[in-house]
């Protein structure tokens, strides 16, 4: 019955969590597109994490498509380990990466060269305490070399802060379809963490509680859409995206 109207209060949906649940083919993407279009009409800011490359051709004004990249300089060691796909139970390899992934590496002009150099120091160390991790250090060397080849279009230490590519008042579609599930989770967690921090700073400034110069990007609420949210916010275990989305 086309005479039955269904209306959505945009102010309410941008101020709380919203789940769009339905079986395959029942119109979830169409509803997302419609909501996005309506928010776009009032110059709102939308961010869609597009896991299946479904929204990059969205036909609405002010669409900003971003191919998701990860700047390893901005990650913590455990996040970088996930992106490099070091196994969770490879404790010694994880330790090698933590020891090598120093602040000096993050700030180095030649990121990969400096990281490889730090791992190489562990491989060739004469310290008896470090000899026991030598085999794992060799393996981490291989993983880092392999990652530069396999993830060349994903890992980019020269891109700066990915947040700079998001535009206020636009529909920002972050294409994460080329990332593995773990990589997408790390990237999503990073964006969500930064967005939460940004909105907190904006809220404090809006109520006149901060004397600092403007240190936020979005003065108005941001509507974030996580496609396949059950993958990144699972019920049975914790993830970076789950933590920051909560």
Q: PLM features: what roles do these ranges have?
A:
Residues 65-70, 85-86, 177-183, 230-241:
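Flexible beta-alpha connector loops of hexameric P-loop NTPases
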Residues 183-246:
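Conserved P-loop NTPase motor cores
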